[in-house]
Amino acid sequence: MAQQLAREQGITLRGSAEIVAEFFSFGINSILYQRGIYPSETFTRVQKYGLTLLTTTDPELIKYLNNVVEQLKEWLYKCSVQKLVVVISNIESGEVLERWQFDIECDKTAKEEGVRREKSQKAIQDEIRSVIRQITATVTFLPLLEVSCSFDLLIYTDKDLVVPEKWEESGPQFITNCEEVRLRSFTTTIHKVNSMVAYKTPVND
């Protein structure tokens, strides 16, 4: 029985990819809600990681995010994705106002068949909960977005990766005159995700 429990708690590369992709699904939803990119009434409450989180009910956005997360899961499994960035821009001017960057490290030795890492789901979820809580708390220091904004998702992958047709190449979309705040990280022992947010420094009149 003890051996079986240890096996169940072991993290595989596939399992790790699913955990990290799921985090991005909830994390992106949290950012879009907290920053008011979509109307608050288009979100619904769900329980995850011991928290009450908000996820979109917008059909087009659900379809888009599901496609991104499924593709991301495959790239995480191949250890070929380096970072995911949520870019928030002024719709009218195109100016980048915020850049949420998640750097992804992958232990490629986990690609070997049968490799499992010892870390409990609970320990991983506790770390993810801390990251999500920080995302929620950023509204206390991020400048108010007083203009209509849109968002883009950038995914940095290995150069030799075959990218689906619907995906476009993009520049890094950096911010001029910005402040950066490093957020917490979490690790499955196979994938490690480091988080930070950069935002345009408000100009004092």
From Swiss-Prot:
**Record PTM N-acetylalanine, positions in chain:** 2
Q: Name one Pfam family in it.
A: HORMA
Q: Which GO terms describe its molecular function?
A: protein homodimerization activity
Reported modifications of this chain: Phosphorylated on multiple serine residues. The level of phosphorylation varies during the cell cycle and is highest during mitosis. Phosphorylation abolishes interaction with MAD1L1 and reduces interaction with CDC20. Phosphorylated by NEK2.
Q: Which GO terms describe its biological process?
A: cell division; establishment of centrosome localization; establishment of mitotic spindle orientation; mitotic sister chromatid segregation; mitotic spindle assembly checkpoint signaling; negative regulation of mitotic cell cycle; negative regulation of mitotic metaphase/anaphase transition; negative regulation of protein catabolic process
| Disulfide-linked positions | none
Q: Which GO terms describe its cellular component?
A: chromosome; chromosome, centromeric region; cytoplasm; cytosol; kinetochore; mitotic checkpoint complex; mitotic spindle; mitotic spindle assembly checkpoint MAD1-MAD2 complex
Keyword terms: Acetylation, Cell cycle, Cell division, Centromere, Chromosome, Cytoplasm, Cytoskeleton, Kinetochore, Mitosis, Nucleus, Phosphoprotein
Q: Does the keyword Acetylation apply?
A: yes
Residues covered by region (Required for assuming the closed conformation and for interaction with CDC20) = 195-205
Q: Where is the HORMA domain?
A: 14-197
**InterPro entries per UniProt:** HORMA_dom (IPR003511), HORMA_dom_sf (IPR036570), Mad2-like (IPR045091)
Does the record bear Cell cycle in its keywords? Answer: yes
Compartment(s) where it occurs, according to its Swiss-Prot or TrEMBL record: Nucleus; Chromosome, Centromere, Kinetochore; Cytoplasm; Cytoplasm, Cytoskeleton, Spindle pole
Identify residues that carry Phosphoserine: 130, 170, 185, 195
Domains: entry comment: The protein has two highly different native conformations, an inactive open conformation that cannot bind CDC20 and that predominates in cytosolic monomers, and an active closed conformation. The protein in the closed conformation preferentially dimerizes with another molecule in the open conformation, but can also form a dimer with a molecule in the closed conformation.
Similarity comment: Belongs to the MAD2 family.
**Quaternary structure, from the entry:** Monomer and homodimer. Heterodimerizes with MAD2L1 in order to form a tetrameric MAD1L1-MAD2L1 core complex. In the closed and open conformation, interacts with MAD1L1. Formation of a heterotetrameric core complex containing two molecules each of MAD1L1 and of MAD2L1 promotes binding of another molecule of MAD2L1 to each MAD2L1, resulting in a heterohexamer. Interacts with MAD2L1BP. Interacts with ADAM17/TACE. Interacts with CDC20. Dimeric MAD2L1 in the closed conformation interacts with CDC20. Monomeric MAD2L1 in the open conformation does not interact with CDC20.
Give the function comment from the record: Component of the spindle-assembly checkpoint that prevents the onset of anaphase until all chromosomes are properly aligned at the metaphase plate. In the closed conformation (C-MAD2) forms a heterotetrameric complex with MAD1L1 at unattached kinetochores during prometaphase, and recruits an open conformation of MAD2L1 (O-MAD2) which then promotes the conversion of O-MAD2 to C-MAD2.
- What is the name listed in the Swiss-Prot or TrEMBL entry for this protein? Mitotic spindle assembly checkpoint protein MAD2A
Q: Which organism is it from?
A: Mus musculus (Mouse)
- What's the name of its gene? Mad2l1
